[in-house]
Amino acid sequence: MLQMILNVTGMSLRNLLKNLVKFLKPSNQIIVGLLFLSSSLYSAVQIVQPSENAYEDIQEALILAEPGDVIRFTSGVFNLQDSLSLDIEGVQIEGEGMDQTILNFSNQQSGAQGLSVTSDNVTLQDFSIQNAKGDAIKVKGVTNIKFLRVKTEWTNGPSPENGAYGLYPVESTNVLIDGCIAIGASDAGIYVGQSKNIIVRNSRAEFNVAGIEIENSYYADVFNNVATNNTGGILVFDLPGLPQQGGHHVRVFNNRSVGNNTDNFAPEGNIVGEVPRGTGIIIQANSNVEIFNNEIGNNDTVNIAVVTYGNETDDETYYPHPKSIQIHGNKFGPTGY
């Protein structure tokens, strides 16, 4: 009977109990209140399978989700025409593996991202996003975001027509990117901007303009990653004209930044379009940056560059020079040829 009521009303058990309380005597409200508390202890798992209505099915699950819920995509290819968005906190979105669960945006008609997240305490894991019209996954203004074994890719190879960013958390706190892969972004494959308390580890960036980029951010550790076949492997940048400036305390260690010799394919006018082909690591206008125990080689132009921001700016608060940079214990291969 309860399941029949839920099916007819379209409510979750938690919402049904909330509404029921309004019509009961105080003594019975206590009982229903205890039932509500019990229901809240258990997260709902919503399973979504590929179908002709994949966009509607997924977006409905994202809209109706409640804190603590899991939205699980089964194996298969989900062909999507519009951008997805999540603004409910405490939700986990998961697939059955980055090579098994694929959200395909090749025919995307609207939206600036594949998936947009604007809520706290979200975990994204075990799925891929392909050929998004803009950024693959953008996360903005959140606390506690995890990307675990997520893959973003533009499958037609390097092109200025590709979306700008693969994984794109910005203006966020407590960012974890672990075991991810980013391929083919026309700006940066893995990008963390204007954020603080950041870990990027065990991930791979390939055939992007910038493989991994930490920009205008505080307290970042980038380690155990591979950046290869990009224009530039790993970038630590600070730029003017942004709400958060003065990037500092970034550690880049135990990474391989090798063979980053792909021609720069950024759209005209992008700042990353100035990165020379064949760059291992660039530090620009940051302070307290430590680069150690990395393998850096076979980058045609330079293995490590420490540079001042050289463009003119009207931002009087911006400091364009790097300071307190430590580089030690790295293994260098051929460069500058």
Residue ranges, per PLM feature:
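N-terminal secretory signal peptides that target proteins for export/translocation
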Residues: 1-24
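Bacterial N-terminal signal peptides
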Residues: 29-39
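Right-handed parallel beta-helix/beta-solenoid
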Residues: 41-60, 77
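Right-handed parallel beta-helix/beta-spiral solenoid domain characteristic of secreted/periplasmic
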Residues: 49-56, 70, 90-134, 156
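Short, T/G/N/S-enriched strand-turn elements that build extracellular solenoid repeat scaffolds
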Residues: 58-64, 79-88
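Extracellular beta-strand/beta-solenoid scaffold signature
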Residues: 81, 105-115, 131-138, 159-169, ...
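Right-handed parallel beta-helix
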Residues: 96-99, 120-131, 143-156, 173-188, ...
